[in-house]
């Protein structure tokens, strides 16, 4: 049986979240769903709409089997740290073998290409060149990936859910699968 992890804020839990859980179960068959969910504080540094216990209850009623808390330092951080913290919690649980996440474009190929690029020396060199021009980091990051891989792969960095998906892919250990 697969045990799937989902990293989320569920602020609040809605039908799209329930659909993700249902689609994950449909794609993988018999599986358990473990969620790493932010606590009282969410990624933008805001207080969640409802307390973490209420949101965890909504997730359980919406199809999750277990909800773990993503500690505040990771929950309120950048996409990279949010992803690393969430994947870290799921890996530490010792049972999750697949990560399920949403993407805006639906095509995972550019996400994988961007994730691989962000770990390369060529990327770091291109990024430094753009940063030296005094541009904001996010713009430099996207420009460096566009220079190396083209517009399609770089565009995913401008879409919040795809950007987070790229960071999930970067944080995944090799033994863990991904389902977008």
Regions found by a protein language model. Name each.
Residues 1-55:
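N-terminal catalytic cores of NTP/NDP-binding nucleotidyl/phosphoryl-transfer enzymes
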Residues 8, 42-43, 59, 73-74, ...:
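Short, contiguous strand/loop micro-motifs
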Residues 14, 59, 169:
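Divalent metal-coordination and catalytic microenvironments
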Residues 25-26, 60, 87, 91-92:
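Non-catalytic positions within long, well-ordered alpha-helices that form the structural scaffold/packing
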Residues 54-57, 122:
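Acidic, Ser/Thr-rich peripheral helices and adjacent loops at domain boundaries
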Residues 56-72:
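A glycine-rich helix N-cap at a beta->alpha junction
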Residues 69-180:
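Active-site cores that bind ATP or allylic diphosphates and position pyrophosphate for catalysis
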